[in-house]
Structures are given as structure tokens and as C-alpha cells.
Amino acid sequence: EICPTFLRVIESLFLDTPSSFEAAMGFFSPDQDMSEAGAQLKKVLDTLPAKARDSIIKLMEKIDKSLLCN
């Protein structure tokens, strides 16, 4: 089973502001390199069109609900 807080971080990565994503990551006490890498990933994802981000989220939901994950 996937940690619900981890799922919240992933949701924040795709849907929230950079500061909200940083706060969500903070629960896991990342070191500076991890925080910087997360911020870079957020910047890259924010450049994707909304349709692409929505499709990625739908794919992750489909994977999570598939028989291969249950």
C-alpha cells in the first residue's frame, strides 16, 4: 500500500504552488540536495501544459486502481 502522505506530495507536485509542494515535502525532512532537486522537478512539471499534467494524473490513478496493484 502507498503511504497517503506520499500521495499528497505527488498531488502537490502536479497541482499546487511551489511553496505548497515544498511544505508537503517538508514532512519527510529532505536534505538540501533533495529539496533543490524537488524544486527543480516542480519547475519542469509546471512548464507542461495543463492537459499533459491532467493526463499524467489520470495515468497514475489508473495504475493505482489496476489489478496489478491490488
UniProtKB/Swiss-Prot annotation:
MF-aspect GO terms: phospholipase A2 inhibitor activity
UniProt cross-references to Gene3D superfamilies, sorted A to Z: Secretoglobin
Localization, UniProt: Secreted
One Gene Ontology cellular component annotation held by this UniProt entry: cytoplasm
InterPro entries: Secretoglobin, Secretoglobin_1C-like, Secretoglobin_sf, Uteroglobin
Coiled-coil region(s): none
Similarity comment: Belongs to the secretoglobin family.
Protein name, as recorded: Uteroglobin
